């Protein structure tokens, strides 16, 4: 099948490679422009662009997707289908109608749950026990199109947004290939989304901040959902302290002061919350690297009784 692929981050790379391995004729890759990244703010190509170059596939990076010249280019390519995997922009109506079989999207949730830009993060943050992949025919709405295939994966307490991301990237690639096979055979179902939708908006800076008056379970899920990016943060000695890993050690009981360090031992720093306690096992002080709790405490004492989050200046 003649395919134009639209995608940007690491999540989309397995899908692009799977299309090529399945024998599809990937005419072009459309991805977002190079962006400054890292401490040096060096212009860096998106992961999908790097993968496309390795596969010798032409790459286009329009500054604006609502552009007459870009739309004309897509029409000239004459794809049978456009596959969209985490491209990062809403596809306008005049592009949706170009391919014979339409635009097919791979979305990282069990629609209609978690429509939007950050479904993986929010599924973990909200303590979901499962999530998954949905492929769908795209329409003008935000992840509202008719579904084709859907498959669930479990989320365990050991999972982070990172591990769920990696599992869904692989699953999404497999379901995309299966979906295009069904589409090409004229056998793809069109299943309208039913039930009450929920939404996964882009993460904001305030979403990273740990509110210690919440429950230990909620904070634990927040930490997992912010790992490996952007990191759940609090404050210690006037500096940002990111907490990367923790465990719930007590579900009940409130601290005298939420955020108070109850103990700081060899393997964990136990912190009181609005209900229950968590044991912090991996953390990172502003300007330093990620460390286990034991290694952190060897270089940075954390007295019992100190309250995290108080020194926000």
From Swiss-Prot:
Attaches a formyl group to the free amino group of methionyl-tRNA(fMet). The formyl group appears to play a dual role in the initiator identity of N-formylmethionyl-tRNA by promoting its recognition by IF2 and preventing the misappropriation of this tRNA by the elongation apparatus. It holds the Pfam family Formyl_trans_N. (6S)-5,6,7,8-tetrahydrofolate binds at residues 109-112. Keywords: Protein biosynthesis, Transferase. It comes from Pelotomaculum thermopropionicum (strain DSM 13744 / JCM 10971 / SI). InterPro entries: Fmt, Formyl_trans_C, Formyl_transf_N, Formyl_transf_N_sf, Formyl_transferase-like_C_sf, GART_AS, Met-tRNA-FMT_C, Met-tRNA-FMT_N. PROSITE patterns: GART. Gene3D superfamilies: 3.40.50.12230. Belongs to the Fmt family. It catalyses: L-methionyl-tRNA(fMet) + (6R)-10-formyltetrahydrofolate = N-formyl-L-methionyl-tRNA(fMet) + (6S)-5,6,7,8-tetrahydrofolate + H(+). HAMAP family: Formyl_trans. This is Methionyl-tRNA formyltransferase. GO terms for cellular component: cytosol. One of its GO terms (molecular function) is methionyl-tRNA formyltransferase activity. Its EC number is 2.1.2.9. The keyword rRNA-binding does not apply.
């Amino acid at each position: 099948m003649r395919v134009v692929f639209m995608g940007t981050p690491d999540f989309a790379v397995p899908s692009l490679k799977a299309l090529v391995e399945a024998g599809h004729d990937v005419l072009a890759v459309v991805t977002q422009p190079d962006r400054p990244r890292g401490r040096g703010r060096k212009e860096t190509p998106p992961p999908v662009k790097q993968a496309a170059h390795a596969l010798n596939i032409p790459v286009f990076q329009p500054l604006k997707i609502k552009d007459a010249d870009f739309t004309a280019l897509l029409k000239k390519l004459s794809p049978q289908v456009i596959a969209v995997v985490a491209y990062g922009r809403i596809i306008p109506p005049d592009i949706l109608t170009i391919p014979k079989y339409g635009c097919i999207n791979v979305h990282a949730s069990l629609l209609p749950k978690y429509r939007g830009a950050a479904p993986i993060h929010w599924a973990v943050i909200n303590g979901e026990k499962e999530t998954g992949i949905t492929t769908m025919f795209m329409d003008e709405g935000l992840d509202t199109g008719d579904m084709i295939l859907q498959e669930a994966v479990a989320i365990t307490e050991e999972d982070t947004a990172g591990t769920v991301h990696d599992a869904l990237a692989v699953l999404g690639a497999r379901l995309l290939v299966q979906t295009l096979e069904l589409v090409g055979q004229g056998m793809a179902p069109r299943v309208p989304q039913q039930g009450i939708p929920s939404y996964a908006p882009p993460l904001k800076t305030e979403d990273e901040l740990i509110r210690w008056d919440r429950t230990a379970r909620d904070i634990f899920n927040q930490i997992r959902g912010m790992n490996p990016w952007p990191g759940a943060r609090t404050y210690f000695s006037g500096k940002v302290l990111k907490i990367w890993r923790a465990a719930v050690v007590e579900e009940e009981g409130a601290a005298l002061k939420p955020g108070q360090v109850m103990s700081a031992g060899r393997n964990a720093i136990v912190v009181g919350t609005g209900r229950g306690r968590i044991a912090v096992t991996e953390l990172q002080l502003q300007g330093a690297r990620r460390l286990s709790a034991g290694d952190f405490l060897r270089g940075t004492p954390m007295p019992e009784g100190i309250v995290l989050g108080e020194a926000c200046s």
